[in-house]
Design a protein with these regions (language model features):
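Intracellular loop-helix junctions on the cytosolic face of multi-pass helical membrane proteins
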Residues: 1-99, 114, 259-297
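Helix-to-loop junctions at the C-terminal end of transmembrane segments
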Residues: 7, 133-150, 236
Length: 297
């Protein structure tokens, strides 16, 4: 995740940035190899002190295991109103928040004539801010119980919507100084949203069906982030054609549309009630167990 945030968003930018910093291909290749080895070492280090699996718990889990189809699992997730609302929040926020990936650097380069040596650092700027914001709000969330995952998600998405409004105004009014402000807001908003949303994904996954629910949420994140990234690039090409090559209008319109999409996702989030969902799970799981038992009979 860290490498994905910090690396440039396009190959041309990466190559140009390397040229500007006088990196040779061999040096750059060595950097990637060393980075991969370092991250692999951290992964092995994270396993130290890992609790051993309890054989008694494993035997009990195997005894209670019931088979079900993937469609049955999806119906289980979709059958609850709270999970449907959370799905729309997760899908829309993921799609529109990362729509900036393929267009933010070209936006600065084409609208404000920034060179690649500067634009390729954008991901490092907002990515580093996002990491620091994530660490800070994890600590604050543990220290202050009032900072619930739902509240953090609300604040994070609201900041992201404001970020895209800033980028939209920057493009439409051609105010270069707003780009820097937008990068800071983007990093802080992503960090807060990351903490709150990951926490909500776990809260919206009942313990007995954690694999099913977490797998579904992860699938939603992957698919809709891809749709947002590809969709933004397609929309940019279409708007360039429709506006006769008016770059400020094309980029500004996409940023504004993303901001509106994030506001809609915020509305969906406001309808989600984690406590109601968790209180319903006893009934839902009992019904599911009876259906599965009848099927086995």
């Amino acid at each position: 995740i860290i490498f994905g945030i910090l690396l440039p968003s396009n190959k041309e930018g990466a190559a140009e940035g390397a040229r500007q910093l006088s990196f040779t291909p061999d040096t750059l290749q060595n950097l990637f190899v060393i980075g991969a080895i370092f991250m692999g070492g951290l992964w092995f280090f994270s396993l130290l002190g890992e609790e051993r699996r309890s054989t008694g718990a494993a035997a009990q889990a195997a005894e209670n295991e019931r088979t079900s189809s993937i469609w049955g699992d999806l119906k289980l997730v979709w059958s609850n109103r709270q999970t449907r609302l959370f799905f729309w929040f997760l899908a829309l926020s993921m799609m529109f928040a990362f729509a900036q990936d393929p267009i933010l650097e070209p936006f600065a380069g084409q609208v404000f004539a920034m060179d690649a040596a500067h634009t390729t650092r954008f991901a490092a700027y907002w990515g580093s801010t996002a990491i620091l914001s994530t660490i800070l709000f994890i600590w604050l969330g543990r220290r202050y119980p009032s900072l619930t995952n739902t509240r953090l998600s609300n604040v994070g998405v609201a900041m992201l919507a404001l970020t895209f409004a800033i980028f939209g105004l920057s493009g439409l009014a051609q105010i270069r100084g707003l780009v820097t402000i937008g990068l800071v807001f983007l990093g802080v908003g992503l960090g807060i949203w990351n903490v709150g949303t990951l926490g909500m994904m776990m809260e919206m996954s009942p313990s007995r069906r954690a694999g099913t629910f977490l797998g579904f949420w992860t699938l939603v994140v992957t698919i809709f982030r891809g749709l947002g990234t590809s969709g933004a690039g397609i929309a940019l090409d279409v708007l360039k054609s429709l506006t006769g090559g008016n770059l400020p209008l094309a980029y500004g319109s996409i940023f504004v549309a993303c901001g509106v999409g994030l506001v809609v996702s915020l509305w969906a989030l406001r309808q989600v009630n984690v406590k109601v969902f968790q209180s319903e799970q006893g009934i839902v799981e009992a019904d599911t167990a009876s259906v599965l038992a009848a099927g086995m009979d």
